[in-house]
Amino acid sequence: MFNGDLDEDCCVMEAVLSQLTYKSGADRYKLCPTRKGNGSILYGNTWRSFLKYGEPDAATGIRPMICRNKDPDAVGKYLSKAQEIYPHLQEIFEEFRDYHFSTFDFSHVMMNRNYDVDWHFDAGNIGESVVIAMGDFTGGSTQIKDGTGVITNLDSHNNPQQFDGSKIEHRVEPFEGERYSLVFFKN
């Protein structure tokens, strides 16, 4: 699928990402409310078994709990909705990583479309993350803030950037246009 040329591979990845349906989960939506069609979705397992409530039973009016499927490879973990809907993405993410940041090990990928999240820490992440953004947009750099409040712009547009989001406060700079991003991380 990819050929090793970062700009060309980002165009291919953008085409893949543009085919997905984006709908942020409740916690991600609270962090950054978005318009329909935009959002942030997790690709990787989760400890949360509960997914949503189903439609009320006609006879009893009780709404059943709909739970995620167990991850067969991880005890006590469940498959994210994106893993179930788009299982082919794992190989795509691994191939992209192998070409462009081959020594980085990841277990999860956060997929974002027009998700201009404000300052935050990635409390659940373990170690460093790699972020890369693609699309036709201006602005939208990944901004990091050091302990003294100094802000540094990381140009993540078709350019992988690595930092520890669990220890370094960061956000997406305001942008205009269509912006997709991937955050590869361990959890």
Please annotate each region the language model reported.
Residues 1-161, 166-187:
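Fe(II)/2-oxoglutarate oxygenase catalytic core
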